[in-house]
Amino acid sequence: MVRFKKSIFSLVGALFILGACSSNSASPESEPADEGEKESKETYTIGVTQLMEHPALNLATEGFQKAIEEAGIDVEYDMQNAQGDNSANDTIASNFVGQNVDLIFANSTPSAQAALSKTTDIPIVFTSVVDPVGAELIESMEKPGGNVTGTSHHHPDSIPKALEYLKNELGAKKVGTVYNAGEQNSRAQIDKIKKQMDEYGLELIEATVSTSADVKQATESIADQVDAFYCITDNTVVSAFESVADVATTAKVPLLAADLDSVPRGAFAAFGVDFFEVGHGAGEMAVKILKGEAKPADIPAEPPKTLKFMVNKKVADTIEVEIKPDWEAEIYE
C-alpha cells in the first residue's frame, strides 16, 4: 500500500515537472519558484501490525493514530491484520523490515513478539499487551532496553477487583473462563487469577479453545457448572464474544468481562480500561521516537492509569441481577 502511494506521487510529480519545463520555455521571464515552496515535509512510514479484528484492538489502533495526528507528524501507514494467524504475524513483520519502515506499531502480544523476532534495529511500540516483561518484549517496565517500548492494557487492580466482586457481590463460588492456552497474553492472566483464587474462596472452571469457532461450544460445556463467567482479554475469545454472551445470558449466568468494550456486546459487567487511551499512550511514545526526542530503550513502558466499572442494564434485567447504587458503576443502556 505504501509503495503504491509513493509510485502515484512520483508520477504526478514527474508530470508537474514536465509541465513546468514547458511553461518556462514559453515564458523565459517567469519568476523562479520560491525556495520555501521546494521544501517538502518529511513523511514517516509506520507499519501497523494487529493480530485480529475486534473492538478493543481496533480502538487501540485508533487511539495510536489520533496521538500521531495531534502531533502534526506526516505519516503513511501500512495497515496489516494477521486475522489471528501467527504465521501471518511473522510474514507481516518480515515485510516491514524489508520495507525499512521508520517504526512498527504492534497491537497485541503475538504481533509484538513477531516484530521483535525480525528486527532489533527498527523501533517497535506495542500496545494491548498484558505482561510485556513475561512476554520477553522488554527487560523491565521502567527500563525497557533494546528497540521496544509500549503500553500494557492490564491494570494491576483489575483481577483483584473482579474476584472480589464475583465473590462478595454476586455470591459466586465457581467461576468459569474460556481462553486460548496458546496465547501468552492469556496464560499470564490465568496464572494471576489462579494465584488469587484461594484468597477469595473461588474455584476456577476452565475451558480452552484454539480458534474463535470453538468458543461457543467451549462456553456451553461448562455453563451448567458455574455460578458466573469471567472473560479475560483473550484475543481469540473476545473476537467471538457474542457467543460467550449468548450462552451466559440464556443460562442466566452473570458474565463479567475484563474490557469495557465487551459490555455493549453482551457482558453483564466489566472491570476494564479504555483501549483508545491505552493506544493513545503508545502513540505519544511513537511521536517522541520519530521526533528523535527519545529512544525506545529509554521510554518506560506504561500500564493503564484508570480502571472503570461498567454494567449493562439490559443484561442485568434479563438475568435478574439488581444493580446496586454502591457499585458506583457506569451504566450502559
Where are these regions (language model features)?
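Hinge/cleft segment of the Venus flytrap/periplasmic-binding protein
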Residues: K288-E333
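Structural motif
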Residues: E76-G98, T208-I222
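Beta-alpha junction/loop-to-helix N-cap segments that form part of ligand/metal-binding clefts
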Residues: N81-E139, D234-T249, V253
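Extracytoplasmic "Venus flytrap"
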Residues: P32, E37-Q65, A71, D78-S87, ...
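Bacterial lipoprotein signal-peptidase II cleavage site
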Residues: G19-K38
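An alpha-beta-alpha
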Residues: I46, F64, T149-Y200, P300-V315
